[in-house]
């Protein structure tokens, strides 16, 4: 099934060119089914790139998805045109009376700050609490995953001695998990972060389950059944060139920045990288949506009440 997004969203032409089925508003109303309502709280600097990445993965599943783009209420995006934000994004305070089958919260370029020093931290805490009454399934990515386990479980984040940047091998630890259906035992995922949360800090009574980790970069994916959440600490959604874009940006201000590990062929930044994680990105999002579809109420107003 296709993904339903605003007709004029820049992602529309990109996804259609890739063969992703995009549904126009007029076409959607003719289908006699309830689409899954999924919100995307986009905290990344380049909103257009990130919304396209997430829409690509949501739109590849067999179910009709209606995507709502959400921003923090009072935070002003500095790297995305104001008219784009005004046209396509809703402040969280304008949607917090609505219910969603799924909600995705992205990473943010604030991970080196203590959580309490992030300007929108108070609202972020309210968002996390709101997901418990208005969202059926939540997927937190990178900084949002760190923030969620700090908010719900008191797990601290730690500075790394150097930025973890590259494509690192990961291990599937719970093959029977519905979220890992179809996963290889060993696979690669992009990592791009300055901080980490540690397996040793997981509270014994938290109910958290480590689904995926790495001997090099630690925790990758946690299942949090009590909060109906998945916490993905890495960037499975990244495009082929995302790490390259970050690297070339970084060396403009930090010439000694290291080349992302296991990314460019032969670690030669002049050679185009190859994507080795695309299939597992689609598997994760497909499995997450399937689990959501199997258990979400048909009457969306019952979300949070059953």
From Swiss-Prot:
Q: What are the catalytic residues? A: 142 (acyl-thioester intermediate), 235 (proton acceptor), 237
Which residues of the sequence carry a binding annotation for substrate?
163, 192, 249
- Recite the UniProt keywords alphabetically: Acyltransferase, Amino-acid biosynthesis, Cytoplasm, Methionine biosynthesis, Transferase
Cite the EC number. Answer: 2.3.1.31
Q: Name one GO biological process term.
A: L-methionine biosynthetic process from homoserine via O-succinyl-L-homoserine and cystathionine
Q: Which GO terms describe its molecular function?
A: homoserine O-acetyltransferase activity; homoserine O-succinyltransferase activity
Q: At what residues does the UniProt record annotate the site feature described as Important for substrate specificity?
A: 192
Q: Which CDD domains match?
A: GATase1_HTS (cd03131)
Q: Give a Pfam family name.
A: HTS
- Catalyzes what? L-homoserine + acetyl-CoA = O-acetyl-L-homoserine + CoA
Question: Where found in the cell?
Answer: Cytoplasm
Named in its record, the pathway it takes part in is:
Amino-acid biosynthesis; L-methionine biosynthesis via de novo pathway; O-acetyl-L-homoserine from L-homoserine: step 1/1
Gene3D superfamilies listed in its UniProt record: 3.40.50.880
Q: Report the family membership.
A: Belongs to the MetA family.
Q: What does this protein do?
A: Transfers an acetyl group from acetyl-CoA to L-homoserine, forming acetyl-L-homoserine.
Q: What is this protein called?
A: Homoserine O-acetyltransferase
């Amino acid at each position: 099934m296709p993904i339903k997004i605003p007709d004029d969203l820049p992602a529309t032409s990109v996804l259609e060119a890739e063969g992703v089925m995009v549904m126009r508003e007029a076409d959607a109303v003719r289908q006699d089914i309830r689409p899954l309502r999924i919100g995307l709280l986009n905290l990344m600097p380049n909103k257009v790139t990130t919304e396209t990445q997430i829409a690509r993965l949501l739109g590849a599943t067999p179910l009709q998805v209606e995507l709502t783009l959400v921003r923090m209420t009072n935070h002003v995006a500095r790297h995305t045109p104001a008219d784009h934000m005004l046209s396509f994004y809703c402040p969280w305070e304008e949607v917090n009376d609505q219910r969603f089958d799924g909600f995705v919260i992205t990473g943010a370029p604030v991970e080196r700050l203590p959580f309490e020093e992030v300007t929108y931290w108070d609202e972020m805490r309210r968002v996390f609490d709101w997901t418990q009454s208005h969202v059926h399934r939540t997927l937190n990515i990178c900084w949002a995953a760190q923030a969620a386990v700090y908010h719900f479980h008191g797990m601290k984040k730690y500075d790394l001695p150097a930025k973890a940047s590259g494509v690192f091998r990961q291990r599937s630890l719970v093959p029977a998990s519905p979220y890992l259906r179809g996963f290889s035992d060993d696979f690669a995922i992009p990592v791009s972060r300055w901080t980490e949360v540690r397996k040793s800090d997981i509270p014994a009574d938290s109910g958290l389950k480590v689904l995926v980790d790495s001997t090099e970069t630690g925790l990758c994916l946690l299942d949090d059944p009590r909060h109906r959440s998945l916490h993905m600490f890495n960037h499975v959604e990244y495009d082929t060139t995302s790490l390259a874009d970050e690297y070339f940006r970084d060396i403009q201000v930090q010439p000694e920045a290291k080349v992302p590990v296991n990314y460019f062929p032969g670690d030669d930044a002049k050679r185009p990288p190859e994507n080795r994680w695309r299939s597992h990105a689609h598997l994760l999002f497909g499995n997450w949506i399937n689990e959501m579809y199997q258990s979400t109420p048909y009457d969306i107003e019952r979300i949070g009440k059953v």
